[in-house]
Amino acid sequence: MDPRHILADVDLGESKIYFSKNPIVLLCGGYVPEKEHADAKDPPVRSLRDALKRKALSMMNAPHIFRPEEIKSWHEDGVYRNLMDFEADLASICSLIAIAVESDGSIAELGAFSQLPDFQKKLIVFVPEEYADDKSFINLGILRHINERHGSGVKVYPWNPKYPLEIPEHVVTGVMDDIVEELNVLKKTQSLSLGNNIHIVVLIYELIRLFVALKEGEIVEAIKGLGKNI
């Protein structure tokens, strides 16, 4: 069955994107150590992101938290030339992007994601209290930019990234509560927009789910038939 014939009858004006009932949180931030083997003792906490990962594992109804480094082979086959392109596509299929500003890498991720319009309203940033009043590029530029577009997108907490073992439990709990609250207020549907890259990713997924075996060229042609070149 040619997907173009099916899509020819689709009314884009009446089409909606229905988001997953099991949302995924892309969690970026500081270093998270891996256990040497399943029976090894847990290593010391190395970052707020590490503490959040452990917190989620101990919760009964924790949000599904995913870290970019869990995919080890992103650079193979030449699909992605750099990590940020990979993370941008990964973020497209996640419901929320949470960033703990506690490392050089997390600052780079913050700068990249904050400039992508599709992500600005699903971005939540956790900033150490000691950085909050600093007249830096991050505060005066990036964080102000996020606040203007997503009023609850920046949260300040009393923790010092240099001393991860001293992160208070109430900080970890508060951050997790903020993540859950953001997920609860996310829109469940959106009108389909071919100008939204996130919607294009969802559309590609649905095409593959419906037609199972599609060549890359067939997917491109099907979406082109809707009026979008990719």
Q: What are the language-model segments listed below?
A:
Residues 1-230:
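Conserved catalytic or regulatory cores that recognize and/or transform ribose-phosphate-containing ligands
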